[in-house]
Amino acid sequence: MVYENPDGIRIGLEIHVQLNKLKTKMFCGCSTDYHNAAPNTHTCPICLGLPGTLPVLNKKVVEAAIKVGLALEGEIAEETQFHRKNYFYPDLPKGFQVTQYDYPIVSKGKVVIEGEDGEHVVGITRAHMEEDPGKLVHIGSIGKSKGVLIDYNRSGMPLIETVTEPDMRSPKEARRFLDKFRNILEYLDVFDGNLEGAMRVDANVSVHWGTRVEVKNISSHKGVERALLYEIMRQKNVIRRGGTIVQETRHFDEGRGVTLSMRTKEEAEDYRYFREPDLMPMRITDWIPAIKETLPELPDAKRTRFIEQYGITDMHARALTSKIMLADFYEGVCAKGVDPKIAATWTADVFLGELNYRDLAISSYGGKTIGFIHAKDPEVENSFKGSDMVELVTLFAEGKISDRAAVEVIRTILDGTEEKTPSQIIEEKGLFKAEDDLVTKAVAETIAENAAAVQDYLGGTEKSLNFLVGQVMKKTKGTADAKTARELILKELKG
């Protein structure tokens, strides 16, 4: 199938990612673990840009950038260097940002996503290293702020800025790209996406192959999709009314779901880049072979292996490999000898589904227990033991519990109200599968009490059978096997 793009939509992204798994900042020894710290307590003369200070490059930043480039199948530069990006803004104490200009460390990469018409390649123009500026805290909304506070704890944090080609053709594709890109970074162990401000996105979008508009500094994948949906609609309306799209920078108001004009778009020359005289150019060709040896199994390779090794579906493999810690958790469960297909169903469909419903984000996996935090309140923590999943899968495979019972146990554990094993929860809640004679009795009672539904089914109304099965499940408090109940009902009705 050829994907139609009648509106000529082109979307490119600029993604700023903090290398927050590194211990220290880009050019000084200040800790990167500042998120719960008081303002301006993780600073020093270097990251505050005080006169007379000199930067000392953190080698691990360069190594992490090379890792990212290799994972993106990009070309790693033989020689790379830093530049000064000159502009005045309160969050930039030096009056310039140390970044890379015409010698980026990575160029010409790619990421394969699920597009609107199957697999779709998004080109990577470049990826380069730079330092993060400080953080402005607006008193009130950004458009009506009565004042601004500055926190320099973030100043000097190591960043990778990745620029894509304008290869995405819908907001949904842009979100899928961001999901895949984040997944790759988490597999590389250079990035923790659960931290506030860890990934910020500038989205460039045009319609009818026309003038592009940049929507600046969007902080979530969902926000990027919403901002693009609005901006595409806005541009179409301007053109429909005979107007002209102006090349400009806009801000996305998350609360209102609209983009607002900030300024006309600067050209690169406005920043007057020049080489950073305090940092020497680097030849990094010799670093690459050793770093390549440290690359982990990446998401696409792991997905393919899961399908081949465990015999699971592509859908389950995609879900399980969408988070490195979830993939490790699943493999830990399978290592205990349980049925990998049943384990995939319960982990990918039920467990992950319950996490998403509760707005919980996976935050850790220590080999035995997977931890998670509430996406909107990181102070809310809980965990789920691999041994509990092994026990559940085993009980289900042995026919001792129904699927409803297994779901109830998972929900009870995630609610965090009881420190008990699955067997203890099942025993206390009476969730062990009902004996055959109990199910047979429940089927007979259901048929006798629901004559209208029986007649409807015999008359050709298939959904009435589902109603009857539901009544049996209700009588047995969910302990009957739904498939068995269905078979017994059909046996009775068809004589």
UniProtKB/Swiss-Prot annotation:
What EC identifiers does the entry list?
6.3.5.-
- Its Gene Ontology biological processes? glutaminyl-tRNAGln biosynthesis via transamidation; translation
The source's domain of life comes to: Archaea
Kindly list the residue ranges recorded as spanning the membrane.
Answer: none
Catalytic reaction(s) noted: L-glutamyl-tRNA(Gln) + L-glutamine + ATP + H2O = L-glutaminyl-tRNA(Gln) + L-glutamate + ADP + phosphate + H(+); L-aspartyl-tRNA(Asn) + L-glutamine + ATP + H2O = L-asparaginyl-tRNA(Asn) + L-glutamate + ADP + phosphate + 2 H(+)
Sorted keywords for this record are: ATP-binding, Ligase, Nucleotide-binding, Protein biosynthesis
Which Pfam family, just one, is annotated for this protein?
A: GatB_Yqey
Q: Which GO terms describe its molecular function?
A: asparaginyl-tRNA synthase (glutamine-hydrolyzing) activity; ATP binding; glutaminyl-tRNA synthase (glutamine-hydrolyzing) activity
Q: How does it assemble?
A: Heterotrimer of A, B and C subunits.
The family note in this entry says: Belongs to the GatB/GatE family. GatB subfamily.
Q: Which PANTHER family does the annotation name?
A: GLUTAMYL-TRNA GLN AMIDOTRANSFERASE SUBUNIT B MITOCHONDRIAL AND PROKARYOTIC PET112-RELATED, GLUTAMYL-TRNA(GLN) AMIDOTRANSFERASE SUBUNIT B, MITOCHONDRIAL
According to its UniProt entry, the function of this protein is described as: Allows the formation of correctly charged Asn-tRNA(Asn) or Gln-tRNA(Gln) through the transamidation of misacylated Asp-tRNA(Asn) or Glu-tRNA(Gln) in organisms which lack either or both of asparaginyl-tRNA or glutaminyl-tRNA synthetases. The reaction takes place in the presence of glutamine and ATP through an activated phospho-Asp-tRNA(Asn) or phospho-Glu-tRNA(Gln).
- What protein name applies here? Aspartyl/glutamyl-tRNA(Asn/Gln) amidotransferase subunit B
Q: Which organism is it from?
A: Methanosarcina acetivorans (strain ATCC 35395 / DSM 2834 / JCM 12185 / C2A)
The organism's taxonomic lineage, starting at the top: Archaea, Methanobacteriati, Methanobacteriota, Stenosarchaea group, Methanomicrobia
What gene name does this entry carry?
gatB
